[in-house]
């Protein structure tokens, strides 16, 4: 009988101890969320200039690839196509890296550049997967619209 009382008492004490261990205390609050970073107008201006320069470089590379015409030679056509896929893929990563490196980029510009990077990735995969023209045309139209928006913001 004493054993049962001892085991019961230990179980009750253990339960209370475990409950107290997990009970939040007034001083045990989660830390407050960090405040959004603030940037000076100079930092924002420099970030915008750098991201716009990155966009111009990628846009130029993609335009060069699209303007090449090497006749009817199938090997030349495939070479140009592979170069275009690489320009889209590396361009999307370059733009994403530019945004990471420039946290002071204005939010509307950052959002547009992210969208363009996503469209470039989609186009690269669609071209490699030989997706139908209507799907590619839709992505190309989105690319044109977003590019025009970025160019207005960078002007």
Set out the residue ranges of the language-model regions.
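Hydrophobic single-pass membrane-targeting/anchoring helices
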Residues: 1-33
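Extracytoplasmic/periplasmic mature domains of Sec-exported, cell-envelope-associated bacterial proteins
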Residues: 39, 109-112, 142
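Long, amphipathic, charge-rich alpha-helical segments that form helical bundles/coiled-coils
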Residues: 85, 89-90, 96-131
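Solvent-exposed, amphipathic alpha-helical segments
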Residues: 54-72, 112-126
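Short extracytoplasmic/periplasmic juxtamembrane "stem" segments immediately C-terminal to an N-terminal membrane anchor
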Residues: 31-48
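Alpha-helical segments in soluble extracytoplasmic regions
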Residues: 46, 50, 58-103, 140-154
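Extracellularly exposed regions in secreted/surface proteins, prominently low-complexity, repeat-rich
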Residues: 121-155
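Alpha-helical rod/repeat scaffolding segments in eukaryotic adaptors/tethers
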Residues: 41, 74-81, 129-136
């Amino acid at each position: 009988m004493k054993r049962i009382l001892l085991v019961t008492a230990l179980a009750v004490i253990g339960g209370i101890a475990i409950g107290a261990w997990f009970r939040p205390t007034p001083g045990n609050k989660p830390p407050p969320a960090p405040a959004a970073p603030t940037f000076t107008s100079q930092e924002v201006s420099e970030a915008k200039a750098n991201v716009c320069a990155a966009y111009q470089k990628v846009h130029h590379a993609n335009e060069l690839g699209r303007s090449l015409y090497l006749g009817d030679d199938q090997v030349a056509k495939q070479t140009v196509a592979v170069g275009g896929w690489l320009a889209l893929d590396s361009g999307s990563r370059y733009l994403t890296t530019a945004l990471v490196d420039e946290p002071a980029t204005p939010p509307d510009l950052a959002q547009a550049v992210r969208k363009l990077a996503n469209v470039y990735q989609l186009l690269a995969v669609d071209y490699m997967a030989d997706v139908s023209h209507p799907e590619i045309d839709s992505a190309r139209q989105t690319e044109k619209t977003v590019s025009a928006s970025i160019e207005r913001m960078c002007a």
